[in-house]
Amino acid sequence: MAGVNSAHRDAVVGLDLDQLGAWLSAAIPGAGTRVTATLITGGRSNLTYLVSDGRGEWIVRRPPLGHVLASAHDMGREYRVMTALCGTPIPVPRTLGSCDDPGVVGAPFYVMERVEGTSYHSAAELEALGADRTRTISTRLVETLGALHRVVPGDVGLADFGRPEGYLARQVARWKKQLDGSRTRDLPDADELHSRLAADVPAESGVGIVHGDFRLDNVLILDDQVTAVLDWEMATLGDPLSDLALMLVYKRFGVGASIGPDPRTAASGAPGFVSESEIIELYCAITDCDLTRFGFYLGLAAYKLAAVLEGIHYRYLQGQTVGEGFDRAGLLVPDLLEAGLEALKDDCG
């Protein structure tokens, strides 16, 4: 990388390129010490960079800047689950190394291979492909989620990756804690939704590897197939129906990397994208799930997403976000809380 200006190379928010280059050259055979990095747009929390030494390219992930919930940005867990899933039917990038020393780039981080594929964020991007291809892509997305939930955690070394017993109750408590720690305004529906969720937690429907943020713009697509599932920062062992419910809430509200308030502009609003009923039918055909208490799961998913977006809104107000779109993060929070309450009305508990 001769001729690269050091001051320019170091002007990448969240990375010390000299330190990172030295670490990469020691950890990855053939990697050079002088690297450049580009922040990949689209990430709402953990920061993702494309790093190159001029010969090879890698993806580096580190936690966000500033006010964060530590357990939601545990790089070691994200690295572990992807490493475990290599060789299974679930497409994940090959992991190359991790570092717990915050002295290298300012926080723990890990490195993985760069996988070919496109991350689709908007309806316009899918409309350019046509309805038939959009239907194929969205079908593959649901099939991938179903396949993930059929993986037996113990078979891939993840038997101790979480505590599935009491998962739903802990989720209710966890997102209340995050929302309380990030709230910047009066949100009366938040208190009511939490109270109703906490008062009627069902027994878990099953145990599986929960991704925690499964949606189209968290996968890569090549030739209409899923080539990689990304953003495992919330992964754990728990109730798989929580992933399905969150996918549907994302679809209803059009939430994705753009954090836009209009579902019509989100990728899941594109012509040909499988409908909610089709998503549920396809998923249940793969997993043989029981949807008796699905209203609770939808209410919890809406509460979780509201807490996540309010946390992003808080970081934006504090000047601790990197990238575009964060000024819109808080717009959907009140509507999500209201939708969560509506979902509980349809619960069969």
Which residues fall in each region the model found?
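Juxta-kinase regulatory segment immediately upstream of eukaryotic protein kinase catalytic domains
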Residues: 2-31
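ATP-binding pocket architecture of kinase catalytic cores
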Residues: 34-209, 225
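All-alpha amphipathic helical-bundle segments outside canonical DNA-binding/catalytic cores
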Residues: 162-163, 289-301
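Catalytic-loop of the protein kinase fold
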Residues: 209-211, 216
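Activation of the activation-loop gatekeeper triad in protein kinase-fold domains
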Residues: 230-235
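Active-site activation/catalytic loop segments of kinase-like enzymes and analogous catalytic loops
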Residues: 242-287, 301-319
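Helical subdomain adjoining the active site within ATP-dependent kinase catalytic cores
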Residues: 289, 293, 307-349
